[in-house]
Amino acid sequence: MELRATVENRIRYSTKHIKHLPPGSITEFDWKDYCPVGFGLIQELEGIDHDDYLLSICTDETLKKISSGKIGNVFHISNDNRFLIKILRKSEIKVTLEMLPRYYRHINYHRSSLFTRIFGAHSVKPLGGVKTYFAVMSNMLHSTIFVNKLYDLKGSPKGRSNKKIEVRNTTVLKDIDFDFCFYVDPLARQRIIKQTKLDCELLEEEGIMDYSLLVGLQSKGSCQGSLDGLNPVYGSFAPPSSFKSNSTKSMKTASSSPDRSSVAMYSCSPDRDSVENEMSMTIQSVTSNSASSETNILATTLSDLFHNSSNINFGMKIPARARRVTRETGEEEWYNVVLYIGIVDTFQDYGMKKRIEHCYKSIQYNSNSISTVHPKIYSSRFQDFVSNIFLPHDDDLSSKY
């Protein structure tokens, strides 16, 4: 079956408010579907009806936004909030199409992949207008999900300040704004790290870099407001005794160095290579008390959490305690949160442009600290970053205090 065949269609649509065209009633769009067979298999795999998909992305308003959009940090959301649309360069479309066969096999075999699913690659060109390339992805933050904070993280703070990107009126923050660690269930952490490794291996083999971890934080029990405006909490798990005896006292963890919080966030967990040993020890610990029915149920649940590869919603609604080190005072704050995570922006290869950018930035900064690096280095650093911000609760936490 040919997964990379391209289909061209011409559709008639309103020209109202479309850039590059004079006002009028009707125009024609040259619409191109790249690899419809391959992306059709992905849509079928994820339970997406193709006709509904086309109706979602071919509305007047959506086409208007796409046709007048800019390349780069621009996201649009379909009217039904099901799909995220990103305008791409032609070279980025090419990277996506070249990866498609292996990408499909990967998400078919690893159903709990953290990849934001790519459902289609298209281009539209109004009659007399400019051709626009774009990809359509799953919207992990659909209209029923409110997040207090949204981060786009690459694992390198160099040049990663916020540039006022917005998704559904939520400002997307970057690495330099990130000051959290997350304490999650040990098996959940192991599965996150293991799946990140599997996903990064594919991207590394395809020569892709510059991807991100999208992290949405939702304060538990709150549907509105900012995380900054909420009172810190300890979370659903009991804090260590040192916390209980002195819960109102601020916990100082930072030195006078202004970069202390960044260091803490990037180096507060064991190395990812110890995950397999952790997993076996955790399972033994959980299952050791077989006399307790609650423990047996918990062991079954946690084993399923880690081993069940058919969980396509993995990465959504992960309960966690968030530890935040404030940059101004170095004090710790704790929040009870629900996490939404996914790997996004898998469109950039390490081509000539990125190689030149790497050389230029290496003159200014440490070559290992910039985001533009060889895919193998990028993959390793990205995995280390993920393992350093996701921590198992209780054991790691108790050992620190």
Curated annotation (Swiss-Prot):
GO terms for biological process: phosphatidylinositol metabolic process. Residues 242-268 are annotated as: Disordered. This is Putative phosphatidylinositol 4-phosphate 5-kinase 11. GO terms for molecular function: 1-phosphatidylinositol-4-phosphate 5-kinase activity; ATP binding. The keyword Transferase applies. Residues 350-371 are annotated as: Activation loop. Its EC number is 2.7.1.68. Pfam families: PIP5K. It comes from Arabidopsis thaliana. Residues 1-390 form the PIPK domain. Residues 242-260 have a biased composition (Polar residues). Keywords: ATP-binding, Kinase, Nucleotide-binding, Transferase. The keyword Magnesium does not apply. It catalyses: a 1,2-diacyl-sn-glycero-3-phospho-(1D-myo-inositol 4-phosphate) + ATP = a 1,2-diacyl-sn-glycero-3-phospho-(1D-myo-inositol-4,5-bisphosphate) + ADP + H(+).
